[in-house]
Swiss-Prot record:
Keyword tags: Coiled coil, Cytoplasm, DNA-binding, Nucleus, Phosphoprotein, Repeat, Transcription, Transcription regulation, Ubl conjugation
Natural source organism: Hylobates lar (Lar gibbon)
Bias kind Basic residues: ranges: 218-231
InterPro entries xref list: HMG_box_dom, HMG_box_dom_sf, HMGB, SAND-like_dom_sf, SAND_dom
SUPFAM superfamilies referenced in this protein's UniProt entry, alphabetically: HMG-box, SAND domain-like
Renumbered ranges of motif Nuclear localization signal: 91-108
Protein name per UniProt: Nuclear autoantigen Sp-100
CDD domains to which the protein is assigned, alphabetical: HMG-box_HMGB_rpt1 (cd21978), HMG-box_HMGB_rpt2 (cd21979)
UniProt PTM: Sumoylated. Sumoylated with SUMO1. Sumoylation depends on a functional nuclear localization signal but is not necessary for nuclear import or nuclear body targeting. Sumoylation may stabilize the interaction with CBX5. Phosphorylated.
Biological classification of the source: Eukaryota, Metazoa, Chordata, Craniata, Vertebrata
Molecular function terms from GO: DNA binding
Region annotation Disordered: where it falls in the sequence: 205-242
Subcellular localization, as worded in the UniProt entry: Nucleus; Nucleus, PML body; Nucleus, Nuclear body; Cytoplasm
Main location: nucleus
Length: 242
């Protein structure tokens, strides 16, 4: 009975390897696995091992979407460099679905049922990805990024527009401000652009000063903590001696 050796030099029976493969699939599926001289590719092609379960959730094709799957594949084979517009593809599927006869529809409905059954089988081994992006820590005391010239213009004229048109939605207010900004003369825009440039320079200086201060590293913190605990222990011992 042949055993399978993984890249980390562990040996498994075929069944154990199948279970272990399912467990590792979502993290890292190694291709350099040996089984009595056979490559993993050979084992997969001959269906001696199951393919690792997908970590990405798949969708089921609806019946009418199957109507153009084969023609689309043929077109792709003949024109490998040509791109397929997804929205146009789906429109054609829907149009063809309305025009074909009931007997022909049955063929595609069967394809959809088979696809659904395949989807349900795959979902039994589906392992969702556990990779979560850690949120970057934002220092609340860090210098705030300065606004652009347009936003300085908006902050000045927004209250005026809201006063004149109290029923306007936020989107409409923004559109009106954008129109006003576009119609403003270049000479008048310079006032806000110069103000924005000054704020940007101040921001750069504040950032440089903030970085120059630096933060005490963790090693230094540990040393200080150790010294404090040592001092506290010595004080307690002195109290006991007294």
């Amino acid at each position: 009975k042949k055993c399978i050796q993984s890249e980390d030099k562990k040996w498994f029976t075929p069944r154990e390897f199948e279970i272990e493969g399912d467990r590792r699939a979502s993290k890292n599926w190694k291709l350099s696995i040996r089984c009595g001289g056979y490559t993993l590719k050979f084992l997969m092609e001959n269906k001696l091992l199951p393919e690792p379960p997908s970590t990405r959730k798949k969708r089921i094709l609806k019946s009418h979407n199957n109507t153009l799957v084969d023609p689309c594949a043929v077109h792709k084979k003949k024109n490998p460099d040509a791109s397929v517009n997804l929205s146009e593809f789906l429109k054609k599927c829907s149009e063809m679905w309305k025009t074909i006869f009931a007997k022909e529809k049955g063929k595609f409905e069967d394809m959809a049922k088979a696809d659904k059954a395949h989807y349900e089988r795959e979902m039994k081994t589906y392992i969702p990805s556990k990779g979560e992006k850690k949120k970057k820590f934002k220092d609340p005391n860090a210098p705030k990024r300065p606004p652009l010239a347009f936003f300085l213009f908006c902050s000045e004229y927004r209250p005026k527009i809201k006063g004149e048109h109290p029923g306007l939605s936020i989107d409409d207010v923004v559109k009106k401000l954008a129109e006003m900004w576009n119609n403003t003369a270049a000479a008048d825009k310079q006032f806000y652009e110069k103000k924005a440039a000054k704020l940007k320079e101040k921001y750069k200086k504040d950032i440089a000063a903030d970085r120059a201060k630096g933060k005490p590293n963790s090693a230094k913190k540990r040393v200080v903590k150790a010294e404090k605990s040592k001092k506290k222990k010595e004080e307690e011992e002195d109290e006991v001696d007294e």
